[in-house]
Amino acid sequence: YVVNPTNVDIKGTITNGGLNLITSIDVKWSDGTNTYTDNLTGLNIIMNGTYNFTHSAQLIVNSLAANSLTVWLEYAADLDTSNNTLTTTIAGLTSIPAKTTVGEEKTGTWCGWCPRGAVALGEMESTSSFIGIAVHNGDPMTISAYDDNIGTYIPGGYPGGGVDRVLEDNPAYFSTMHATRVTDIVPCIVNSITAVYDQSTNKISVATEAEFIGNIIGDFRLSCVIVEDDLQSSNSSWDQENYYGPGGSGNSTNMTFPANVNNGFSFNTAASPVPSASFGGYDHVARSLSNNDILGDAGSLPSGTVNLGTYNHIFTDVSTNSLAGYNDVGFNWTKAHAVVMIINAVTGEILNAGKTALTSINIVDSWDCDPVNGCVDPGTGIGNYSALATCNAACNTNSIEESNTLSFNLYPNPVKDRLVIEGQYTSANIYDVFGKAVLTTDYQNTIEVTAL
């Protein structure tokens, strides 16, 4: 893709796959109407050697029409001409749109090396032109249609990382892969996304506008993934295996979230497995895939050629009870985003993408127990109590102060499933009524006590 009008250099690399030295060769290219030839002489290309060339004739792009380009070599001594020709299409654009990359991470709670991918995505959160998606395997967060097909673009073991389904590597290299892809010229952009959660229907509605900056030939589609942060459950199937903890094979490798992500939790000091609440829950989790098709929604963009202009699409509503892991963690719309991608359905390449936080309508009253203000409606519809009277009955808050320097708030009292401690502390010991220590933990805002 190039900005119209412009002249394009025809460049390439010649590789000598034969035994004989190549001293001269003809390089030709055609736009379907005219053919241009360079007779290259004085060469010294040995067996398996290479030579980089730039053709003396440039391709002139002076419209938004697609330019078919064929480049080939002619060498009389070549016994195998099957690998001498390359064909591509060069399209003119009216401008260069901003590029956003998508980093997909293959992960699973069963995978002891997978904290590496979680930390890598956490490190990329400060990069606004990067969108991270965690694609889970073999655990309650798995979306079969996503998990079954992501290996086509990110082959190999776990964890695995890839950007735009073009580059794939260790997820620790997300930053490098992003830097490579974000400078690529693409012919399209996601202009806007509207994502609304309706609590009266428990459905998520997403609409988008995409824009193509030229007349682009191909099969392109729009795709939407709902992602959510801070997913945690006391169910043991949500515990994360961890090879980076004390005595683990990876303990010598620093595996710590940035300070502003998950409170800087370090897997290096955590046991295995790690309860999800200990590290603040799973982030960037793919919870739904539109049309259950990794290549996007068929018919969401014109087929054959997508002409210059804007295109609107409304995705099929998502029922929240169909979200991956819903039975364990439900859905918190305040921590969810809609990711819209423009995908080449032939190659799988993600050309561009956008992300937006969900908004809401028809939110019902609910209440949380605030240690200072008592029962408060958070306005999210997902407070811990659906009735104010129930909240008032349970909201018996204890406050502990020491020397006017340290202050802690603990609630609810009595505690049932989770104990919330508001305040700064290093560690906590919990004792039963007989004075026996039943739990020792490092700093956590929320402590699971279901098993006590």
What are the residue ranges of the model-derived segments?
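Residue-level detector of functionally pivotal "anchor" positions at catalytic/ligand-binding pockets or at interdomain
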Residues: Y1-N4, G92-T101, T359-V364, C395-Y411
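Short, solvent-exposed loop/linker segments at the N-terminal edge
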Residues: Y1-N7, Y197-T201, Y411-V415
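Asparagine-centered strand-capping/turn motif at beta-strand->loop junctions
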Residues: T13-G18, F212
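Intrinsically disordered, low-complexity Pro/Gly/Ser/Thr-rich segments with frequent PxxP/GP/PP motifs
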Residues: N34-N62
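Terminal connector regions
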Residues: I60-G92, I342
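Short, conserved sequence motifs used for protein processing/export or organelle targeting and
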Residues: A76, I131-I363
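Local sequence-structure signature of Cys/Sec-based thiol-disulfide redox active-site neighborhoods
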Residues: S95-F130
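C-terminal outer-membrane/trafficking sorting elements
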Residues: E401-L452
